[in-house]
Amino acid sequence: MNFSPAWLILLKLALALIGACFTRQPMNAKMRARAPGAFIRVTDGLIHYQWHGPLEGPIIVLVHGLTTPSFIWRDQIPALVRAGYRVLTFDHFGRGYSDRPSKRQDLELFISELDEIMKTLQVRKSYHLLGYSMGGGVVTKFTSLRRDQICKLVLIAPIGFLKGQPNWMARWPLAGNLAMFVFGGWIMHRGAKKAALAEGVDSKMVALQLRETKYAGYFSAVLSSIRHTIYTDMRDAHRILKERNVSILAIFGEEDSVIPQNTAKLLSEVNNTAQIVKIKGAGHGLVTTHSRQINEAILRFLHE
């Protein structure tokens, strides 16, 4: 029997869909048994978190970005702990060991998530916030709404000034959902390998990043975040932070292909009190590839 090219394409798509259905693992109690740290229950589900460092140290909360959960802070945590800080890390919904609620992943969700984490863990004293990529947008908006407990704000390659539109998968709900479900693993593998080759992200970090693609709910969370968070304009939030005299450090990689090169300039135009640091030769994976420069800049800023 001869099959037309169209039928062969449909057959391959069907096989890919079946494969995706049967290879994604649920994030359940069995999977969480291997997790370091602990869990808390908030309104939308379980959140995986970890405390690091001395109990009485000044607190800094690290908020990760779009695709890589809290293990992205592998190279920042030791430096902060050695400097005496009490470090809190956690996984956003849909990533790491946290739950996968079927909710729109917009700023409202992420702000509620962070707010409930701090309240549930009973963090009553002031703290610093550090956000990377999408996490930079989350902490910017969060701080503009809740200034009272936040001392200083560190942004690493933050969103908030992206122009244009998301890709077709984010714009077309049904087709995009299906494409992300079927081909998301391939897309992530290609992106991770590209980062390893172009930026020098090490193989251990790449392996951890690709492990995320094996879990159910991960791709839908990422796609929803692209649709509803990544392209959010943060200029008004930054204006509020300037009015309130919030101390801000913003770090950018000079070779970042994800966050546009003019972002530092745009941020400075809105808030000329923000300190800007540009790291030569660094791409979007700078927290891993240029951790020494990142850590030095963070600690210098926090100690001022």
Give the role of each language-model region.
Residues N28, P166, F181-R244:
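Conserved alpha/beta-hydrolase catalytic His-Asp/Glu region
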Residues A282-S291, N295:
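Catalytic histidine-centered segment of alpha/beta-hydrolase-like enzymes
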Residues H52-Y97:
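Conserved HGGG/HGGXW glycine-rich cap/lid loop of the alpha/beta-hydrolase fold
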Residues E255-I259, H284-G285:
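Acidic catalytic loop of the alpha/beta-hydrolase fold
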Residues R244, A250-F252, D256:
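Short beta-strand/loop motif that positions the catalytic acidic residue
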Residues M1-P58, R82-Y85, R235, H303-E304:
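Alpha/beta-hydrolase fold catalytic core
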